Structure formats: structure tokens, C-alpha cells
Amino acid sequence: MPTYETDGQISVSLEFEIGSVWIRATKRTDTVVEVRPTSAAKDADVKAAELTQVDFSGGRLTVKGPKQRTVFSSKKGSIDLTVELPAGSEVHADSPMADFVTEGPLGDCRIKTSMGRIQVDRAVGARLKTDMGDIRLGTVSGDAEVTGSGRIEVGAVGGRLTVKNSNGDTEIDEVHGVLTANASNGRIHIGLAEGDVEAKTANGHIRVGQVVRGKVGLQSGVGDIEVGIAEGTAAWLDVHSKFGAVRNALDTAAGPGEARETVEVRGATQVGSILIRRA
């Protein structure tokens, strides 16, 4: 189990083909790495763990697994990797088939896998991508980009958030910057949006619990649209449904009057109802 003295934040690079990763970031002065075979009874897993290289130099930790001819085979080795490191460290990881879980505050976090789930607790910035699997992102103080095919859950993002989901529901708690969310098949639910919003889905409902200001564009092929307008915000509306009811529960006015904020809402659905209400 390699242990390195690390007085401050470090950068981490992980490259391997099959397995799982657990990263724990805390206030500490060392970094501990453990590489284990996923199954100690499987020769391929044991060999993959033995051939995995771990190196630390110049504040950079590198973990590199052995190259395997093909990933999608029961004969290929799988490793379980655990890294305990200082809070605020950067993590960049790339694996064709792996699950990732992080706990504690990280710096910039970039994780990419073709097949596997990704769960990130906290980060300064995040870029997460899986071609097949769920993604859960907790809190990001800066910008975040999430691309997946499965269920996507995002907590709070302080900056810009971009989400692309090819098949699955998308749940976003709150975004304080610009939000762009696109889904081929699945619902998009947004709790609080304090900036511009652009959300599109070919099949699914779109719900925004509360918008405060800016421009909001919502589009669904088949699905309902619901938007809550914050108290003290005046709204300009341009909403249409080809086959469905449109209901505006706001009080009408000739202009914004003494409203503290203004929002422009454009919404369209081919099949579904639209509701605009106070949040």
C-alpha cells in the first residue's frame, strides 16, 4: 500500500481498463493508494493488480493499469482502487469500464468511462461522462459538464451547468449560473434556476420549480411543461402547445412595474399541457 508525504493539494491521473475507484479527500498530509484485485480468487484480477503501476512525483500521482487486448471479456482482469488524499486535489480519470465514487472536497474533477456509474460528492469544477450508467454530482462551486445515458442527479452548481442525457431522467436541485440541459428520452426537473435556462427533451416532462431572472427556453416533443416564477419577478411569456392546455396562473400586467427582477419564458410542446405559476 504505497504512502506518500503530501503537504498540500496534489493532482491525480488514473488510467486503467476494468474495475472500480473510491477516492476520499480530507484534511491530511499524506496520500495513500491501495490496489486490489476485484476477486482474489480470479487469476486475471490478481495479475491486473500486480501489473498496475503507481508513481508519485512533483505533486502528481499516476496510477496506470496494464493494457488488455479487449475489455469486454470474462478473462480480463479487474482491479479495485482506493485513494485517500488531501482535500482540494485534482482528479483526472479515464477507464472504459469502471465505477467511480468520490467523498469529500476535490478541486477540478474529470472522469470518463464508457460503461459505469459516476458519483462525485464535492468539487470546484467537474466534467463527468459515461456512455452507459448513472451519474450523481453533489456540489460544485464552479462550472460543471455532465454527459450520460441513465439517471442524472445534480445537487447545487455555483457556475454554469451543461447536461446531456441520451436516455434517462435528469434531476437538478439548483443552478446559479447558466443552465443548458438536453435529453433524447427522459424528464428534466430543475428545482431553482437563478440564471438563463435552456432545456430540451424529445420525450418527457420539463419542470422548473423556480426561476428568478434571465431567459428561459423550454421545449418538449411529448410532455408537459411547468414553470414557477419567483415572487417579485415579472414574467414575459410566449408559450404554446399544439395538443394540450395552456394555463397562466400569474396576474396579468401591462409591464414589469416595480418588480425587482424580470424573466422571459418561451415554452413549446407538441403534445402536453403548459402551466405557468408563482413559485
Where are these regions (language model features)?
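Intrinsically disordered, low-complexity terminal regions
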Residues: M1-A279
